[in-house]
């Protein structure tokens, strides 16, 4: 009986944490994200940073579901799904790159996966859904990405595992 009570209490505490996560990652909504790069040759610049192994970012403005943020930093995300030969590469977007504390609903980093190895577009979002039932895990949903006014495609939008994630899920960033 004691063990059952402990299980119910800890499960309830965990579920409360999960339910309080940002509505930004609700799976019943496809987010709309517009990136407007400062430079016309943004793809060449990002390809160059990637090939050279540089950790730098290039500047863009971003509109997320109608809210606009300026001077965000953009780079490619990851390694295995990035290629200078792909038109649709994954993106890591830092909202507070130049403007301190700039965020969208408390989120300061967007991670857009290109889903290049998942033709169903289901695996990543579904696996995070399952994981969150048993342990802390990132939230994920979908976003249509527009670049300089052109629809670039459907991406998965995955919550970054950063200090905010650690504090929300474990009470400390350490």
Language-model features: where?
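Bacterial Sec-dependent N-terminal signal peptides
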Residues: 1-21
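Phosphate/dinucleotide-binding and metal-coordinating scaffold of catalytic cores
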Residues: 19-174
């Amino acid at each position: 009986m004691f063990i059952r009570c402990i299980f119910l209490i800890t499960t309830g505490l965990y579920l409360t944490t999960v339910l309080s996560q940002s509505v930004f990652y609700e799976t019943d909504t496809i987010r709309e994200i517009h990136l407007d790069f400062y430079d016309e040759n943004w793809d060449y610049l990002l390809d160059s940073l990637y090939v050279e192994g540089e950790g730098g970012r290039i500047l863009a403005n971003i509109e997320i579901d109608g809210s606009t943020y300026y001077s965000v930093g953009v780079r490619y995300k990851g390694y295995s799904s990035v290629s200078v030969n792909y038109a649709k590469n994954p993106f890591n977007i830092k909202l507070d790159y130049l403007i301190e504390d700039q965020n969208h609903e408390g989120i300061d980093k967007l991670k857009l996966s290109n889903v290049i190895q998942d033709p169903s577009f289901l695996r990543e979002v579904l696996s995070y859904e399952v994981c969150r039932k048993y342990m802390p895990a990132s939230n994920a949903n979908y976003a249509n990405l527009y670049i300089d006014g052109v629809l670039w495609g459907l991406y998965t939008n995955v919550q970054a595992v950063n200090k905010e994630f650690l504090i929300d899920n474990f009470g400390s960033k350490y």
